[in-house]
Amino acid sequence: MGATISILASYDNPNLFTAMILMSPLVNADAVSRLNLLAAKLMGTITPNAPVGKLCPESVSRDMDKVYKYQYDPLINHEKIKAGFASQVLKATNKVRKIISKINTPRLSYSREQTMRLVMFQVHIISCNMQIVIEK
């Protein structure tokens, strides 16, 4: 959620950041069907405190040691996600997908799918253009 909030803040206040490095931005909700999106919005409005789902610990990291620590960390909320929260996350994600091309703040995005390879991001640092390609 941090990257999503940063993107929304950058859109609302274009001069807020000089540049952004976004870790795992939540901008791809293609896996969610339209019916599920509609159901989430409806449930989020009618029954915002209803439990709707739980975060799969294996989605937190591929490092099983970290997954184990996550599962047994007493400071982490292991309850189900509430409908109101899920609805707001989907709403924010949908907005980000619509506005991301309008944001001029230089950004480097890094997601789990790109662990082995980051391809062709332009990062502008003090009027110096750099192209970053990292390959293993």
Curated annotation (Swiss-Prot):
Transmembrane segments: none
InterPro entries reported in the protein's UniProt record: AB_hydrolase_fold, Hydrolase_4, MAG_DAG_Lipase
Superkingdom field: Viruses
Family membership: Belongs to the poxviridae K5 protein family.
This protein's name: Protein K5
